[in-house]
Amino acid sequence: RVARHRQPDVPVMTELERNAALELLTDPQLLPHILADYAAGGLVGEETNKLICYLACVSRLLPRPLSVLIQSSSAAGKTALFEATLQFMPPEAQLRWSALTSQSLYYLGRDELKHKILAVAEEEGVSEASYALKLLQSEGRLSLAVATKESDTGRGRTEHYEVEGPVALLLTTTRDDGDGELANRCLTLSVNEQPEQTAAIHQRQRAAYTRDGSGSEAQVVRTRHQCAQRLLEPLGVVIPWAEELTFRTDQTRY
């Protein structure tokens, strides 16, 4: 018998929360606002990486979401970026696991992954399920046929399992030699490990223990972003200059 993953309950949004979320979404300086909220939550620097991770999680709602692999040496800050981004996303929009077995994704409910964020803190945790993840990213769905026996007659029969995507994948890794095919389907981000960034992190950690840096507003900021995510609706986008966009033709990946 397949145990289903229990989806978190979606809290009822108050009028105050809704207005705050709409104010965020209609801010002409939305991207700087997002960066400021990351900083308010204690994550310094990494401006480009912050925006890429945030937008990749928003892309879960698109027909072909982005996937991100955050790479760094141990204790260099990849997990901080990973956690800070997910805290801005509604709990019901994400599935977080430490590891996946080879066929675990096939036995989820049909729509349990659809337009969700699949987050695994270390790439090694998905090594057994890498084939399923590649299929999910390239085809947007999974299907599995399993041979079983009928309990009453003992006759063989085939059971079919189908799981619909798409899904946005968020991973971290310390390895340079991970699954190349999986990495090819992700945007690989390198965390800043320069001394200046380390010094800024140390300063932020010291400030966190002062009265002004106690972080009392952090939960308010997270709630505002989560409510904003719940208000997002699908809208068509037209790029007037799309025909003028060009890319290198001597490489298939950049």
Predicted region positions:
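Substrate-gripping "pore-loop 1 plus following alpha2 helix"
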Residues: S98-Q103, Y131-G165, T210
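Conserved AAA+/SF3 P-loop NTPase catalytic/coupling segment centered on the Walker-B
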Residues: H115-V146, T174-R185
